[in-house]
């Protein structure tokens, strides 16, 4: 693996650990030339999925785009990064199980909302307010009331 610091092409693996139920491998490496250490992650490359947006536009599925939206919803909330990684892994596993080359963005949004609801109520409402495009405060209040009602 090429060193990100000095660009030397070879490095030694110092430590290897499985993460996310063995779906990801974390490796600590040491550059043979400069001696600096760095971390790499390995994950099985999934089959490409095309996301069909509400306006009919198609774009390739991007894990980072999903993570960005979830991180934004969880901003300054006590949600561990591991929970967000697990959420993304679960959604990707569910998408792969569908075995469909194209999935509507609404399906992914529903998957995110279902999982966020169990992780953090505030993050759920934040995500829902953008995803559902609440037109006014009344619609937002309905969502909060629904959440409170289900929590009882």
UniProtKB/Swiss-Prot annotation:
Keywords: ATP-binding, DNA-binding, Metal-binding, Nucleotide-binding, Repressor, Transcription, Transcription regulation, Zinc, Zinc-finger. Its cofactor is Zn(2+). Residues 49-139 form the ATP-cone domain. GO terms for molecular function: ATP binding; DNA binding; zinc ion binding. GO terms for biological process: negative regulation of DNA-templated transcription. It comes from the Bacteria. Binds 1 zinc ion. The keyword Nucleus does not apply. A zinc finger (unnamed) spans 3-34. It holds the Pfam family Zn_ribbon_NrdR. Belongs to the NrdR family. Negatively regulates transcription of bacterial ribonucleotide reductase nrd genes and operons by binding to NrdR-boxes. This is Transcriptional repressor NrdR. It comes from Roseiflexus castenholzii (strain DSM 13941 / HLO8). The gene is nrdR.
């Amino acid at each position: 693996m090429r060193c990100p610091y000095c660009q030397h092409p070879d490095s030694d693996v110092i430590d290897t650990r499985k993460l996310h139920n063995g779906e990801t491998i974390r490796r600590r490496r040491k550059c043979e030339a400069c001696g600096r250490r760095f971390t790499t992650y390995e994950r099985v490359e999934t089959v490409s999925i095309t996301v069909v947006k509400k306006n009919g536009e198609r774009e390739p599925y991007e894990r980072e785009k999903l993570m960005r939206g979830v991180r934004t919803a969880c901003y300054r909330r006590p949600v561990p990064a591991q929970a967000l990684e697990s959420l993304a892994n679960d959604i990707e596993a569910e998408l792969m199980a569908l075995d469909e080359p194209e999935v509507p963005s609404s399906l992914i949004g529903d998957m995110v909302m279902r999982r966020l609801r169990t992780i953090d109520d505030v993050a759920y409402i934040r995500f829902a307010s953008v995803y559902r495009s609440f037109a006014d405060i009344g619609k937002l209040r309905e969502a909060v009331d629904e959440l409170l009602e289900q929590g009882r």
